[in-house]
From Swiss-Prot:
This is Translocation protein sec62. Residues 225-273 are annotated as: Disordered. It comes from Schizosaccharomyces pombe (strain 972 / ATCC 24843). Residues 238-259 have a biased composition (Low complexity). One of its GO terms (biological process) is post-translational protein targeting to membrane, translocation. The chain crosses the membrane at residues 133-153, 168-188. Residues 154-167 are lumenal. Pfam families: Sec62. It comes from the Eukaryota. Belongs to the SEC62 family. Acts as a component of the Sec62/63 complex which is involved in SRP-independent post-translational translocation across the endoplasmic reticulum (ER) and functions together with the Sec61 complex and bip1 in a channel-forming translocon complex. In an initial step, the signal sequence seems to bind simultaneously to sec61 and sec62. sec62 and sec63 are required for interactions between sec61 and translocating polypeptides. Residues 1-132, 189-273 are cytoplasmic.
Amino acid sequence: MDSSNVPVLKDEDKCKFSMRFTNFLKSRPELKTKPAILNGKRVYYFRVKRVLRFLTSEAYTPKKYKGFPEISSREEAIEVLKLLIMNSMLVRVDKLPPKQRKQKLVELQINRNQDFQDDMHYVWLYEPLPKRVMALAVLFALVVLALVLFPLWPMFMRKGAWYLSMGGLGVIGLFFVLVILRFFLFCITAVIVRPGIWLFPNLLADVGFCDSFKPLWSWHNSKSEVKKTRKSKKLSKKATSPAASATPEKSSTSTTSLKNLRHRNPTVEEVSE
């Protein structure tokens, strides 16, 4: 990148510029970022040609943003991306072959050779804290402060807090009662009506609150599990059938040989003295 277009920045200013420029690029739809998995974490990656095409096009308007450099060539855009790499904003990755046929997210692997060819892929490493998380942190701090000042609360607020705590304990108690009741119901129906019925089958599943109570009931084995068991039984029968068919053939050959021995005509053999 030409030094006339970009001012000389200190280390702190370079870091701030990298964060601002990264947030700007992440918000641009021209990059067409896609979700993927890198080291077990969900990340977003993009192609080099898309970011270079955007930075050298008319869609990139640096005059609207203070401190953004003017970019007129591919080399200048690459220099800006190198600055982002030096500040750990992005890193080059390679796609791994899929482990399954229908894999939802692509798995990535870091490539140490930080080059900028058109078909190469890069991942955003910089993830700023969302405003929602910061708001929740402030709210949590205020709640803790309010609990610490509980002795200074007026009497009506203390009574309200006591009623709320009792209501929360009641909800937790009802949840445990529901878990015990559905277990007893399953044990009874497993004996009377096999394979058994579960009340609120998704109650303990890793789903949302509303989905935990859908459906109202279901059988112990789902349709997919029943199909799998049937297929396994069919495969086991097919595997055992050749061995079973092979044994009668052996027995039939042995019986035919015995019959031939029985119906053979008597013969006289000469014995040399």
